[in-house]
A protein has these predicted regions:
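Charge/polar-rich, low-complexity and marginally structured segments
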Residues: 2-150
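Terminal membrane-proximal soluble interaction domains of membrane-associated proteins
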Residues: 151-155
């Protein structure tokens, strides 16, 4: 059963969005037009996870036919591949946002999902710690190498 993440009500399978098609399309568009995945909604990722749980239930159910299991396995593999690609593309974008913000000051991250904020904060802290150890100091324009600290940095 798939649930609408906004209303928490069940959605009939035939009425559920084709999340695999949506993710594959997003992935293709991202390759052609970088930045498209900035617009992905958390409900899209949640819908993909809900659909994967549904496929898993079909595969594990003792009453499922072999044909239904085979279809669920194939669909699940495709959906997992698309979801993996989407998540890793998002991680790369978050890393790029963090690097840009340290290089040039504040950068508007665009549409960051709530679950991605923690990752962005952790990456920002790690980058700042590393740059500080390398002799950089924070300025309004981002982290800049300090001449006074260059002499004290050991390699």
């Amino acid at each position: 059963m798939i649930f609408d993440t906004d209303t928490q009500l069940p959605i009939a399978h035939e009425e559920a969005p084709d999340i695999l098609h949506d993710l594959l399309l997003l992935r293709k568009m991202e390759m052609e037009y970088p930045g498209v995945l900035q617009d992905i909604q958390e409900r899209d990722i949640n819908a993909a996870r809900d659909r994967l749980r549904e496929y898993r239930n079909i595969v594990l159910s003792p009453v499922s036919s072999d044909e239904a299991r085979d279809r669920a396995i194939e669909s699940g593999k495709s959906l997992m591949g698309a979801l993996e690609d989407v998540v890793f593309i998002r991680v790369k974008k978050i890393i790029q946002i963090a690097c840009d913000s340290h290089e040039s000051g504040h950068v508007d991250p665009g549409a960051i999902l709530p679950r991605e904020t923690e990752l962005l904060d952790a990456i920002n802290a790690a980058i700042e710690g590393y740059l500080t150890r390398e002799g950089f100091t924070p300025t309004k324009e981002g982290m800049r190498l300090s001449m006074s600290s260059v002499a004290t940095v050991t390699t």
